[in-house]
Amino acid sequence: MPSGRKWLRVSSVVFDASAILALALGEHGSDMVRAARPDAIVSAVNYLEVVSKLLRVGLDEAEVLSFLGEAFPRVIPLDRSQADVAARLHAGSRELGLSYADCACLALAAERGLPVLTGDRQWTRIDVPVEVRLFR
């Protein structure tokens, strides 16, 4: 490798909040999440959801932020294009009960052409050009 050049890891999967929570809380399926983690990216909206949920269950804020910062360094901001896609998904999927965060995750995956890793079986019923992988 040439010296002085920074090599970037290519992402291969987008994590939904359920995947991050499974890893953080040691839930069923966390082994599959752990294996995919080095190549994962996370929407900032899902990151917000995870931090909020972990703090609500009483975990220490400094520990939560440290763990997430080390485990998931690639948090992708929500841009206008993703927000537009997420809004259309949210409006068209009321019967599935998708949250804004769910739709932001799917929009990021669609934009990047990546599969999404989730624990939510409802996602397999969504009409969106994204491969949905279940970890449990």
Predicted regions span which residues?
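Short, structured coil segments at secondary-structure junctions
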Residues: 36, 71, 128-129
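Histidine- and aromatic-rich ligand-binding microenvironments
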Residues: 15-16, 42-44, 98-100, 120, ...
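Acidic catalytic patch
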Residues: 72-93
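Short loop->beta-strand "edge-of-pocket" segments that line small-molecule binding or catalytic clefts
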Residues: 13, 39-41, 71-75, 115
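Acidic, PIN/NYN-like endoribonuclease modules and their adjacent C-terminal/linker elements
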Residues: 1-12, 106, 110-136
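Short, well-structured N-terminal submotif of metal-dependent ribonuclease cores
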Residues: 1-42, 54-66
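Nucleotide phosphate-binding site architecture
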Residues: 21, 51, 124
